[in-house]
């Protein structure tokens, strides 16, 4: 028996810190908005199980977006981004999430982020407690020192495959 998924995909253009981003998101459900951010290096497919869960989507409008340069979301459109340093700052991502919620006209959304997204959830709670009904920091931390694996640079290791495989293992 075949079944068509009720999940739909859309693009929205938002402006963040003077840059325009074309952001892809999936959504399903009715009720209070639940905005979901994937882990770094992944995309909104991480939330597919949640997007198709009938019990969840009968109470929540689940929205899972792709960060810029991830999944189906593009780098900024109004700049020569390939010539610029790719900056990953808490300020930028907090501004990005708020701009996305504003563009989608979400009132009192819940925000859930995994790993890097969990870190963003904590920053949202700190900086915009009035804007969100609540945040869920899945594997989030208030401080992430970062890491570097020397063996990824070894000629016998394919870092792209290793990273992709590791990220896939984090998906819900």
Where are these regions (language model features)?
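N-terminal cap/lid segment of alpha/beta-hydrolase-fold proteins
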Residues: 2-22
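Active-site micro-motifs of SAM-dependent methyltransferase domains
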Residues: 42, 69, 118, 142-143
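Conserved HGGG/HGGXW glycine-rich cap/lid loop of the alpha/beta-hydrolase fold
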Residues: 21-79
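Gly/Ala-rich beta-loop-alpha elbow adjacent to hydrolase catalytic centers
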Residues: 113, 117, 121
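Flexible "cap/lid" loop of the alpha/beta hydrolase fold
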Residues: 122, 126-127, 132-169
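Active-site loop/oxyanion-hole signature of alpha/beta-hydrolase fold enzymes
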Residues: 17-19, 64-112
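Structural signature of beta-strand start/N-cap positions in the alpha/beta core
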Residues: 33, 61, 107-110, 131-134
């Amino acid at each position: 028996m075949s079944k068509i998924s009720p999940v739909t995909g859309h693009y929205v253009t938002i402006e963040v810190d003077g840059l325009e981003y074309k952001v892809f998101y999936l959504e399903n459900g009715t009720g209070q908005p639940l905005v979901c951010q994937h882990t770094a290096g992944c995309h909104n497919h991480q939330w597919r199980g949640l997007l198709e869960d009938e019990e969840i989507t009968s109470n929540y409008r689940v929205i899972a977006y792709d960060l810029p340069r991830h999944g189906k979301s593009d780098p900024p459109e109004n700049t020569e981004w390939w010539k610029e340093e790719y900056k990953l700052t808490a300020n930028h991502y907090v501004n990005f999430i708020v701009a996305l919620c504003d563009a989608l006209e979400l009132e009192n959304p819940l925000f859930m982020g995994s790993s890097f997204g969990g870190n963003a959830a904590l920053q949202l709670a700190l900086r915009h407690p009035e804007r969100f009904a609540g945040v869920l920091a899945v594997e989030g931390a208030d401080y992430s020192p970062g890491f570097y694996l020397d063996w990824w640079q070894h000629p016998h290791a394919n870092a792209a495959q290793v990273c992709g495989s590791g990220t896939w293992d984090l998906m819900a």
